[in-house]
UniProtKB/Swiss-Prot annotation:
Its main location: secreted. InterPro entries: Scorpion_toxin-like_sf. Belongs to the short scorpion toxin superfamily. Potassium channel inhibitor family. Alpha-KTx 14 subfamily. One of its GO terms (molecular function) is potassium channel regulator activity. It is found in: Secreted. The lineage of its organism: Eukaryota, Metazoa, Ecdysozoa, Arthropoda, Chelicerata. This is Potassium channel toxin alpha-KTx 14.5. It comes from Mesobuthus gibbosus (Mediterranean checkered scorpion).
Length: 54
């Protein structure tokens, strides 16, 4: 049973890493465009207080 949960945990971490690379599904708050350049790939703009990472 522990092995099953370990495999699920690994799959969850890998899928989150893929989402982060392709565009995060989570809202990332920002104040300026430079805040987004550190948190998202591709230097996206900051609009309405959130990074446009997609």
């Amino acid at each position: 049973m522990k092995i099953f949960f370990a495999i699920l945990l690994i799959l969850a971490v890998c899928s989150m890493a893929i989402w982060t690379v392709n565009g995060t599904p989570f809202a990332i708050r920002c104040k300026t465009d430079s805040d987004c350049s550190y948190k998202c790939p591709g230097n996206p703009p900051c609009r309405n207080g959130f990074c446009k990472c997609t």
